[in-house]
């Protein structure tokens, strides 16, 4: 675990999550600013969030996995795909990035367009119970899309994972905005709420709904539909951050072999 945290690759990954969430929140919230000359449309906001997540998944996904969402990070932990320590660092980086992105937009947007900075709230007489279920469903489909399109075990063509994920986020917003403003991402809800100091009594909805929805998707995908053939000790090693796959061992063996050959010469 200590080895994982101290590695340069791990630090780069944590920074990538911070940066990606900052950019995602900035562009997403900016699309919802209420300019007096032209109010935003549902389609505009949905496309902005979808394009932002697709772009960032393509750009920074190779560095960190492109979670950009605490619900997805925690779901991958539930699915035994990442270590506990990585999950903690990622979630902290995402939340700080979301606050930074919302803060930058707050400083740049004029007061007459800023509004409430697109803080999530319950719309159209939606009850907290209804909102939780909606957020669960929206995030469930997003998480399934992410798990399937980025699964290295797939042998069938998957196309562009970034495009698929971006379209999934767009789909969620086209439906969810009418209910909750559409979160699907606790960081997206947390950032502007901190900057605007507007934590409504229903703020918990935007944590519980996405996290539960993504976790259910992880259980379904990684344990029922496409389970990993890992032993209990290997699963524990994944959580602890000490697991090394056969591919990792093979790469290390080849590196040692090359080093020995160079030393011999």
From Swiss-Prot:
A Pfam family annotated for this UniProt entry: MIP
Side of membrane Cytoplasmic, spans: 1-12, 61-65, 75-87, 148-158, 225-265
Disulfide bonds: none
GO biological process annotation, one example: protein homotetramerization
Record bears the keyword Transmembrane helix: yes
Keywords, alphabetical: Cell membrane, Cytoplasmic vesicle, Glycoprotein, Membrane, Repeat, Transmembrane, Transmembrane helix, Transport
Membrane topology, from the record: Multi-pass membrane protein
PROSITE patterns: MIP
Domain of life according to the entry: Eukaryota
Motif segment (NPA 2): 185-187
Intramembrane segments: 66-74, 181-191
Catalyses which reaction(s): H2O(in) = H2O(out)
Entry GO terms, CC: apical plasma membrane; basal plasma membrane; cytoplasmic vesicle membrane; endoplasmic reticulum; microvillus; plasma membrane
Purpose: Aquaporins form homotetrameric transmembrane channels, with each monomer independently mediating water transport across the plasma membrane along its osmotic gradient. Plays an important role in fluid secretion in salivary glands. Required for TRPV4 activation by hypotonicity. Together with TRPV4, controls regulatory volume decrease in salivary epithelial cells. Seems to play a redundant role in water transport in the eye, lung and in sweat glands.
Record-stated family: Belongs to the MIP/aquaporin (TC 1.A.8) family.
Subunit structure as annotated in this protein's UniProt entry: Homotetramer; each monomer provides an independent water pore. Interacts with TRPV4; the interaction is probably indirect and regulates TRPV4 activation by hypotonicity.
Protein name, UniProt field: Aquaporin-5
Species of origin: Sus scrofa
Gene, per the UniProt record: AQP5
């Amino acid at each position: 675990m200590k080895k994982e945290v101290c590695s340069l690759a791990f630090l780069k990954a944590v920074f990538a999550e911070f940066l990606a969430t900052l950019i995602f929140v900035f562009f997403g919230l900016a699309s919802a600013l209420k300019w007096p000359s032209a109010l935003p449309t549902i389609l505009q906001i949905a496309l902005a969030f979808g394009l932002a997540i697709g772009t960032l998944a393509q750009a920074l996904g190779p560095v960190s996995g492109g979670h950009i969402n605490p619900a997805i990070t925690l779901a991958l932990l539930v699915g035994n795909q990442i270590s506990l320590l990585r999950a903690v660092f990622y979630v902290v980086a995402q939340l700080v990035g979301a606050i930074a992105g919302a803060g930058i937009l707050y400083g740049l947007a004029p007061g007459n367009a800023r509004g409430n900075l697109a803080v999530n709230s319950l719309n159209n007489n939606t009850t907290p119970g209804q909102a939780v279920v909606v957020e669960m469903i929206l995030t469930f489909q997003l998480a399934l899309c992410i798990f399937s399109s980025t699964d290295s075990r797939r042998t069938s063509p998957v196309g562009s994972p970034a495009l698929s994920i971006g379209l999934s986020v767009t789909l969620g917003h086209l439906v969810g905005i009418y209910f909750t403003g559409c979160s699907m991402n606790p960081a997206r809800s947390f950032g502007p709420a901190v900057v605007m100091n507007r934590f409504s009594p229903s703020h918990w909805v935007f944590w519980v709904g996405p996290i539960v929805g993504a976790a259910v998707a992880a259980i379904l995908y990684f344990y029922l539909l496409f389970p990993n053939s890992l032993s209990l000790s290997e699963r524990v090693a994944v959580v602890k951050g000490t697991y090394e796959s056969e591919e990792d061992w093979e790469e290390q063996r080849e590196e040692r072999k090359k080093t020995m050959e160079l030393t011999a010469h």
